[in-house]
Every structure is written in C-alpha cells, then in structure tokens.
C-alpha cells in the first residue's frame, strides 16, 4: 500500500468517527480535514467530493457489519432454516440496531442520499453490500422452506426490508427522542419484542 492510499484510509477512518459522532448534515470537508490534520485540498484529492466521501464511509461501516454477520451465518450453516434466521435476526439487531451511533448515522445518511440525489452508479458498492447481507437471510429462509421449519410467507424480500427497516427505525426514533425512552433496557425490550414478532411469523407450526 502506497503513502497516498494509507493517507486516504487514515482520512476515511477520521471521517467515520466524525460522521458517527455528529451525523452528516453540517459536517464539511474542512471539518474532516481538521480532524485528520490534513489540508482540505488533500481531502478533495483523495475523494473528489463530499458525496463520495460520505458514501465511502457508509460502505466501510457496512462492510464491517457484513463481515461480522457472515461469520455468524457461516458458523450456523448446520442449523435449521428457522434457527438460522432467528440467530441472524438477533445478531443483526445487536450489531446494527443497538448501535445507537450507527443508527443515527443511517438516519442522517438516508436524508443525505435523498438530498444529494445519489445516482445508481454512485450507490452501486453501497447497495451491493446491503444485498450481500440480504442474501444471507434469504439463504436461511430458503433452507427453512426445504427443511420444513419455516412457512412460505410469499414475498420474502418485502418482508425482509420491512422488518429490518422497522428495527432500525425503532432505534432511530428512540435515539432522537432521548430521555428515559433511550435507556438500554427500554430499547432492548422493544427490539426483543419486534424480533419475537418477526421470528414467530416465520415459524412453521405444522
């Protein structure tokens, strides 16, 4: 790895810290440069523009989540489809939903992508990582259909995206609200309730 690539990765790591702490709105390239102790021109040279930097941060953060989810998925391939999807849902909730800083970042990212009108090409790597995570859940679902532990719910993609968005949105709403509703115990109880609803919906009780 050359010096330029090392410097770019260093700036990227600093940018992730800033975005996780402060969100995306209101954070400028100058703010990132200051945090990394680099010139603004260097930050632009590494990433081109702010949108590209934000998307690279999002990709990097989701890659870390994806890799950890994959470890859990591959470790439990011998389990039934229902057990796999239950384990994945619980782990996803712990890894993604219970991470308040990441939930806030995702909320800020959604708003940013709409405002900046990111093109399909610009989002390609980001969307590909989310698809890889979805594919693991889909694999568990399909196995459950074969081994009889999961019932056919029709459109699994629709259910998956509704379920994951519900979990993430719950965390985001409670995080934004603050106060007593933001206690770890309260958040975890609500997440557990949603997980139980989702996994019960899958179960084949015949």
Whereabouts are the PLM-identified features?
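Helix-turn-helix
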Residues: 10, 14, 18-56, 60
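Amphipathic, non-transmembrane alpha-helical scaffold segments
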Residues: 4, 54, 58, 62, ...
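C-terminal peripheral helix-coil segments that are non-catalytic and often amphipathic
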Residues: 91-94, 135, 139-147, 161-206
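Amphipathic alpha-helical packing segments from all-alpha helical-bundle domains
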Residues: 67-70, 117-147, 157-161
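Hydrophobic alpha-helical connector segments
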Residues: 56, 71-101, 157-163
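N-terminal intrinsically disordered/low-complexity leader segments
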Residues: 1-6, 73, 206
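Amphipathic alpha-helical segments used for helix-helix packing
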Residues: 96-120, 172-176
